[in-house]
C-alpha cells in the first residue's frame, strides 16, 4: 500500500504530511480495535 501507517499515523495532510497536536482514534467498527490515529487541525 502507498499509505503505510507510518506515513499518516498522528499526522494531517496540508499539502504535505505534518505532525498533528490533536488526534482522533480510527476504530474498526466490526471489532472495536484501534487501527491508528489521525491528526486534525483547529482554527487555533
Swiss-Prot record:
It comes from the Bacteria. GO terms for biological process: catabolic process. Its EC number is 1.2.1.28. The keyword GTP-binding does not apply. GO terms for molecular function: benzaldehyde dehydrogenase (NAD+) activity. It catalyses: benzaldehyde + NAD(+) + H2O = benzoate + NADH + 2 H(+). It is an enzyme of class 1 (oxidoreductase). Coiled coil: none annotated. The keyword Oxidoreductase applies. Keywords: Aromatic hydrocarbons catabolism, NAD, Oxidoreductase. Belongs to the aldehyde dehydrogenase family. This is Benzaldehyde dehydrogenase [NAD(+)] II. It comes from Acinetobacter guillouiae.
